[in-house]
Amino acid sequence: MSWFWVFVGFCLLIVLHEAGHFFAAKATGMRVERFFLFFGPTIWSVKRGETEYGVKSIPLGGYVKITGMNPEEDVPPEVAHRSYYRQDVWKRIVVVAAGPAVNIVLAFAILFGVYWANGREEIQQSVGAVRSGTPAAKVLQPGDRIVAVDGNRYAGLSTEERLVKFGETVASHRCDGKQVDGCVAKAPVQLQVRRDGQVKTLTVYPRYDEEAKRALVGFSYGSVNQPVGAGAAAKEAGDAIWEVAKGTAHVFSHLFEAEQREQVSGVVGISDVGHQVIEEGLERALLLLAFVSLSLGLVNLLPILPLDGGHIFWSLVEKVRGRPVSLRVMERATAVGIALVLMLFFLGLSNDIGRITGEGFEVR
């Protein structure tokens, strides 16, 4: 059943994205010929007014067809004044930007609602969960409060900063020789914990985790939710969006670095995560929906054709030059853009396969 809701969420984000383009085009007087979910052969369609609405068979996105999006398109004289390329540059930018804008606004609305309803999550210095089969499973219990790691208490730091230091101390314990997945550190970590009012010193040997790229003990910290007002919830949502935007920009500006290429995920990976998260509860599912919507909006703003950001970029170039960009330049830019989009698609697919099977297309 969770896979069904992953599919529904995916369809919802596509429909809302395309609806942004659709309503903006209508509002600026453009003629919309088609509004379709998915690509490929048509499964179902109906025409209402001048627009055909429908569903196609390949679930890889959706599209809104506006008259005159292609400068070489044959447009009937009676509707030529409503074609895309006959409109002012600002109108074209509004229409193209409306799709990503809807995704970003939706992400903000969901994050705001979740933060306002549930409060701000504050990390605790106590053990929240212990992963089975890990070194921690033999010595730690949920509720144990971590007092010190290797004798280091890191007094004077905030809880978040202290826990980062604890993690760095654990990660400093390395295997003897090459760091491979599952290898055991040559020296143990001394954990001081408070349990039932008593302080105990526990000895545990961390194991290297290939996915995390560091040695881990195998537990997560607990957290509590502190109530917040509407203003604080809005700030939390805005901060989260800003952090994701910075992270997205960093990944795409450093794609030639192996570590950053590994951060790219595709439809398979997102679906797999969605399937797992939905089973964890509504709040986690809503947060995932928000961040996928945000990512969809941000990635579409990349300044490459045929993405929305590419159309915005070349519209701005036209505005600066004072005349349209030649069709030859646009065709070359589109060819390069499609190549980049395909590269990102296969990179994401390779990473997804690697995460699921341990293998990939060896592009990392």
Briefly describe each language-model feature range.
Residues 44-47, 126-131, 315-332, 361-363:
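Membrane interface segments of multi-pass transport proteins and intramembrane proteases
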Residues 10-14, 65, 103, 292-300, ...:
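Alpha-helical transmembrane segments of multi-pass membrane proteins
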Residues 109, 113-117, 297, 301, ...:
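Hydrophobic membrane-targeting alpha-helices
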Residues 74-90, 98, 102-268, 358-364:
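PDZ peptide-recognition modules
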